[in-house]
Amino acid sequence: MKDIRDFDSLQIKLASPDTIRAWSYGEVKKPETINYRTLRPEREGLFCERIFGTTKEWECFCGKFKSIRYRGVICDRCGVEVTHFKVRRERMGHIELATPVSHIWYYRCVPSRMGLLLDLQVIALRSVLYYEKYIVIEPGDTDLKKNQLLTETEYNDAQERYGGGFTAGMGAEAIRTLLQNLDLDALVAQLREKMMEKGAKSDKRLLRRIEIVENFRVSGNKPEWMILSVIPVIPPDLRPMVQLDGGRFATSDLNDLYRRVIHRNSRLIRLMELKAPDIIIRNEKRMLQEAVDALFDNSKRKPAIKGASNRPLKSISDMLKGKQGRFRQNLLGKRVDYSGRSVIVVGPELKLWQCGLPTKMALELFKPFIMKKLVEKEIVSNIKKAKMLVEQESPKVFSVLDEVVKEHPVMLNRAPTLHRLGIQAFEPVLVEGKAIRLHPLVCKPFNADFDGDQMAVHVPLTQAAQMECWTLMLSNRNLLDPANGRTIVYPSQDMVLGLYYLTKERSLPEGARPRRFSSVEEVMMAAEKGVIGWQDQIQVRYHKCDGQLVVTTAGRLVLNEEVPAEIPFVNETLDDKRIRKLIERVFKRQDSWLAVQMLDALKTIGYTYATFFGATLSMDDIIVPEQKVQMLEKANKEVLAIASQYRGGHITQEERYNRVVEVWSKTSEELTSLMMETLERDKDGFNTIYMMATSGARGSRNQIRQLAGMRGLMAKPSGDIIELPIRSNFKEGLNVIEFFISTNGARKGLADTALKTADAGYLTRRLVDIAQDVVVNEEDCGTINGIEYRAVKSGDEIIESLAERIVGKYTLERVEHPITHELLLDVNEYIDDERAEKVEEAGVESVKLRTVLTCESKRGVCVCCYGRNLARNKIVEIGEAVGIVAAQSIGQPGTQLTMRTFHVGGTASSTTEENRITFKYPILVKSIEGVHVKMEDGSQLFTRRGTLFFHKTLAEYQLQEGDSVQVRDRARVLKDEVLYHTTDGQTVYASVSGFARIIDRTVYLVGPEQKTEIRNGSNVVIKADEYVPPGKTVATFDPFTEPILAEQDGFVRYEDIILGSTLIEEVNTETGMVERRITTLKTGIQLQPRVFISDESGNALGSYYLPEEARLMVEEGAQVKAGTVIVKLAKAIQKTSDITGGLPRVSELFEARRPKNAAVLAQISGVVSFKGLFKGKRIVVVRDHYGKEYKHLVSMSRQLLVRDGDTVEAGERLCDGCFDPHDILAILGENALQNYLMNEIRDVYRVQGVSINDQHIGLVVRQMLRKTEVVSVGDTRFIYGQQVDKYRFHEENRRVEAEGGQPAVARPMFQGITKAALNIDSFISAASFQETNKVLTNAAIAGSVDDLCGLKENVIIGHLIPAGTGMRRYRQVKLFDKNKRDLDVQMEEVIRRRKLEEEALAQAVAGMEGEPEGEA
């Protein structure tokens, strides 16, 4: 017989009245629940035993039949079947309604499904259903139209006029008739025709109507089933009534709602029998409709029906939705048995894989195991006695407990479980007391500390569960962070301080030499006797260095002796970063078990020597640099100078503010550097505060700055920086105004933390919901697409090297050495650490790789596109739930980011603006391109953006007279190739591979060409083919203003600059100067303020459009030289770079929201020109090289980034503002959008120092791009504007093409994560996410089938999840022995034989004793 729980898919449909009656075991006719005297259910009431089953096990209501042997008998007296009381959880009843009523979900939920089918507005539909208006069902040959609404008077007039020539009705009955009369096939044909006519102009409503009609046609549901004539009554044990202590009853709200329905229904039947007046019956029908509405969805009704305690009653819909609903509360999150929780304390004596479990807890958790063991060992004869023994806590129990607990893992969990390392398995060690002991190194993955945190313990029961704990979940197998593959288990705080102190080296006095020792033992004796210090430099022969003499310290020898012998000699000062690198090196190059042993050794040494060091803090350790006073005076002078420039009218208010902030930021930074140097010199580098910060044990440079430097600039709650800095530090103490400014930041930190934690949690939830069904499910999808990877740079600084980005992925194309063309990587080759480094060393610029974004697996992803499983440092296995890991990896730091603000105490962390272009390495300039003006001093002033092309110089060689060069200019040169012969016969070889450039008497070896942007207004001081040493200024500019410069000599002429309409003149009260500012606020006037430069005869040489807030710097008619500043635009005022901007930004990107002030992007590449105004917006035209023009509308208030005659690329911004991802998709396509999103999201996290691997972000972005929008239907079944899954779209197109038809065309769609999660194939998963009613309504109409492919839907229905060993492909695995015999069958045979033998033995023993045993 097939198991009811064994099914592969689940379908939801509308129930017809007959189906509802078929479910039912009887009709509920009375509103009574239970009898107040006997407390037994009333007959035909809401708890009736005849309908729903007996309340007493194997007994009928009247007690005539009492026993399991009457199972299935129906009592002739009371009519109750003798059965188990659990049937009261599954048997349903029904209520026959006196008049049909509408189901609230189908007419009230937006968009109204009934309204769409009948083409009626919700208001009209409502007025019919609530008996306010009549609707024409059949107009006959009258002037009335079908579906026309009539008021009472209009209906009466029509009756008089036409008599019985037409049919009209009101209420659900009328709507039912209309729905019954619908011909769906004709309707859909008519609607599709309408769609074809309208084409692109068709509205969303039409698309929705077609979709709904199609759904009804395909699913086999009938539209009239949305009207109910019979209501199901859910089983009584799902709406229980419980007696409280005081004899009162608590009941489920559903009983009240059902009672109202039954009351009104009975009253309506009575009124109809009495032939009451129409108006009364109509009112009663309306009330019945309202009662049924409230039963199904009380929250939608306004006002909601309230109960006795004046709170709205919980209807069936409310039971399902929300955090406390059935889905999230009971199906996705269940309380589990065999669990406990307690406070955690640190357990430094434990091994990494152990945890301390209180004996009291273990006794309760392992109770059944102990009882079984007691019976097995024959300490007691049966389970009952064993239970008593355990409850008495007798000594025998404890001896058994040790055996039971030994090698039985437990799982520890700390809420919130933000990523998979929030639950790990440990081997329990029994401890005294009531607190769980936790190994200090696993605090990081759990994010636990010991300030009162609690943790939960769970016991895995089955053999398979225990096996999983040992092999997969044990803490020593989870050393790497799944988000980025770095180690997550590493020493911190005290341990780091101890290790740093132990391995630090004291500098020797001048002229002194390190003492020599012959062996480690000798060094240890000398150190213990105090002859040398632990940090003194010594020379010793050491076995890890093949007995060679090494210069080291006694402390480092201690460390090397304690760690496992296989680990190479560590001879450096260990701070937190180096410790982490050391662990990673051992883990990746040697062995994970070795890394575990080393971690435990490092923990022990760290604690020992932190105690030994005995770090203390005193006021004298906080040293304020002596130069602080002079530095503050210098800064004050600079601020005064800026103020006087402002008063003189040379700079604007915004520039003044920006420059003041810049001065203080710089001063604060310089003071911090000086302070750190002072601390480093103090006590020969053993200043406690300095050690704590540099070792990374506690505190940061920023915090020490506040203690001993100056607190610096603070931020207002809005994020603006207060230009008045706090000059004092905490040692000197703050004055009143400084203290007052500080309070802002401190409060904001706390408020932010509280608010943002919830946001981060919600972000994780949405991410999990969109990615939960992505599982690795095949080896290779066979795609030919991929993405090009390069190193991530910020300016010249490499943030993430190419090796770091490509490691752990598969190649898409061959990778060759750029100079020798030697094959480095083949197609579809896995890139491990060695290969990645080899590629980087070869100087490869970019590699094309396979990525999750381009994976073509229909469901989930394939191994080759995913690559490495970061948590295990191995290639991912089939069955890995990568979607959930990706969601957790992005969501988990989100929560960390929110907590970040308040540690600094609100001090502003603004980045200092650069005002020059310099390079940290020597370069050779190739060319400088862009519009510029030659200045008198020979420099070039750029009047628009330009580009500098250059090569990085790798080596240079000076040629002497007579040297013969052996390479050509610009030729490719390999390492060790001959460059030139000198006059004295020597040969000079190339030290590196590169390109040769011969300029004058120098040979340069340079790298590939690079380029950097030159800002508008920059003064470039170098020329083409010039060699620029590192640090030399290439160009200077003003970072705070965006100038518009004259490009020719000539005279200034104003156009459309009219005082009072486009020009405002203001007298600045602080400076007394007149400031002239452009404004475009007065709309309606078609004016475009601009400045012309003309020659003497008035011919225009150049024109400049002026944006809002531009400051005029020249008078009309003035003569100007090329390069004069005509107009200045202030750059935006500085804000602090804080993650509070980060989390909403991540949310905005993942939700695919259009930014508030999105920039207008150029739709094609071409030349810009301006063509007047349209509705108060500028028309910017871009003409491509075929002469085709594309118009763009730009608001007058926006600052233009292009000028007349500029060349732009497609997708380039025409005005200021953020990029809109939807525009990027439309203009540049899917790949560009993917790159933009990946970079933006990564940058937000990178600012906070959080690294997330691309594959995680890529997985989520891929899910957001799953759908496409149909733009041309062809011969397919699609509708214009329909949103279809990519794979379904391609499948349908293949089908049509095979039949020789015209395929459909679609454009890619970019959906936010919430929308994408709701549009997922699985209705169970979508319903458990959000908008439960809406999802279920749509699914029921469409007769949706859930194939149970995701994780969530399987958890909900209680199946194994289709990931890991639960994948369907692994469920049919059978084991065979060498002779191909089924091992399962053999095992069953062995067990059967054993049982028979045991039974025979038991009988023999019983026969010998002559009587059966006692209670066993």
From Swiss-Prot:
GO terms for molecular function: DNA binding; DNA-directed RNA polymerase activity; magnesium ion binding; zinc ion binding. Binds 1 Mg(2+) ion per subunit. Binds 2 Zn(2+) ions per subunit. Belongs to the RNA polymerase beta' chain family. One of its GO terms (cellular component) is DNA-directed RNA polymerase complex. Keywords: DNA-directed RNA polymerase, Magnesium, Metal-binding, Nucleotidyltransferase, Transcription, Transferase, Zinc. Zn(2+) 2 binds at C781, C855, C862, C865. DNA-dependent RNA polymerase catalyzes the transcription of DNA into RNA using the four ribonucleoside triphosphates as substrates. This is DNA-directed RNA polymerase subunit beta'. It comes from the Bacteria. InterPro entries: DNA-dir_RpoC_beta_prime, DNA-dir_RpoC_beta_prime_bact, RNA_pol_asu, RNA_pol_N, RNA_pol_Rpb1_1, RNA_pol_Rpb1_3, RNA_pol_Rpb1_3_sf, RNA_pol_Rpb1_4. The gene is rpoC. HAMAP family: RNApol_bact_RpoC. Mg(2+) binds at D449, D451, D453. GO terms for biological process: DNA-templated transcription.
